[in-house]
Structures are given as C-alpha cells and as structure tokens.
Amino acid sequence: MSDKPDVKEVESFDKTTLKKTTTNEKNTLPTKEVIEQEKSGGSD
C-alpha cells in the first residue's frame, strides 16, 4: 500500500448529485454576562 491516498473516486465525484440544504443557526455558548446573571439568580 502506498503513502498517497486513492483520489480516483474524489476526482470523479459529481457535485451536481448533492442536495442543497439550509443551514440552521447552531446553539451558541452564553456570554460571561449571561452566566454571571444566572449564577446570581437574576434569570427571572
């Protein structure tokens, strides 16, 4: 087996077969301010 990967399949890949997807917003981490607010019990 050689060190180089087999790229034959990648080179012949047809991009038109891919489906268009919509990207959803990922859950972002809370800011330091939000964390401090929740720690102090000011979430209500």
From Swiss-Prot:
One annotated Gene Ontology cellular component of this protein: cytoskeleton
Keyword NADP appears in the UniProt entry: no
Biased composition regions of type Basic and acidic residues, renumbered to the chain: 1-17, 33-44
Signal sequence annotation: none
Bias (Low complexity): 19-32
GO biological process: actin filament organization; regulation of cell migration
GO molecular function: actin monomer binding
Keywords: Actin-binding, Cytoplasm, Cytoskeleton
InterPro entries reported for this sequence: Beta-thymosin, Beta-thymosin_sf
Region (Disordered): 1-44
Principal location listed in the UniProt entry: cytoplasm
Pfam families registered for this protein in UniProt: Thymosin
Compartments in which it is found: Cytoplasm, Cytoskeleton
PANTHER family reported in the protein's UniProt record: THYMOSIN BETA
Role according to the record: Plays an important role in the organization of the cytoskeleton. Binds to and sequesters actin monomers (G actin) and therefore inhibits actin polymerization.
Family in the record: Belongs to the thymosin beta family.
Protein name from the UniProt record: Thymosin beta
